[in-house]
Amino acid sequence: MEYEKEFALEQQYLKKTCDFVRENLTREEEACADEKDQVIAARREMWETVSFRGGFDNAVEAHQALESIQAQSARYDAAHKRIDHLRQALETPYFARVDFTENGYESDPAEKIYIGLSTVQDEDSYETFVYDWRTPIASLFYRYETGPVEYLAPSGTIRGKVSLKRQYDIKDGTLNYFFDSDVNVIDNMLREALSHNASQKMKSIVETIQRQQDMIIRDTLNDLVFVQGVAGSGKTSVALHRVAFLMYEGVAQRLYANNIVIISPNNLFGSYIANVLPELGEENIASLTFETLFSNVCSNDLRI
């Protein structure tokens, strides 16, 4: 009976979240269509009115026109990325929840932290429906069981208590089931994920990241991180999720996908891991083999 009551409450929250996402998706799609029309119109106008012949004045005019188009194209690309995130959120807005009470606020109700692939937030009211799995507070889900916890926020270390850890199975915007656990919360989901891993492509492990893996993924203290392990121990998965984390953290430092490269043993391996970052809502990164790298860096006389 208690489960049915909780299930009904969770369905209400899921509906509220999906309704908000759907509303924003419609608005973003309309805005994106407008941006596309503006980019096309600006390009047409440039080719019809701007002269690319010699002369300083013409060069300045052409440069200004190109800068304007690049700015419009960047806005269009950003809108398109937001649409991709919203579509993804509409399918599975979140996969976990932790109830957290910060020290000093024990008399207040615990804050329900829903965790998903990307943040879902009302920019007007600042209500956060879902926290990105890479946010500092989301580390509570990966690193702790119920009880005393702490996480490192931009303002410093935040301490408190987790009173509930919950995981969800949500597909196509429908809640199939959830379960709570005080001990080894991710074992059930991990076993299920592994049982469905009969695929020719590597999958993301964002729902089943272990404590030690999370510490590697979020490490910002070391410039170089070496991870050792036997074959099949998850080294590549951790590396790709670390890439997603670094791109999320590196927005302020302008760290983008084209700043990162994977050195793969062969092209087949590069194809095998190609789906992970898009699953996480990030742009894919370049993958080179050692042979290609040496061919590009070294002289043509070198034979491998």
Identify what each model region corresponds to.
Residues 1-206, 210, 214-218:
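Extended, charged low-complexity regulatory segments
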Residues 221-225:
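Pre-Walker A (Motif I) flank of P-loop NTPase domains
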Residues 227-229:
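Hydrophobic anchor at the beta1->P-loop junction of P-loop NTPases
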Residues 232:
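Walker A (P-loop) phosphate-binding loop of P-loop NTPases
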Residues 235-236:
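Conserved lysine of the Walker
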Residues 239-240:
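Post-Walker A alpha-helix
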Residues 243:
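P-loop NTPase nucleotide-binding module
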Residues 247-304:
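Alpha-helical nucleic-acid-binding subdomain
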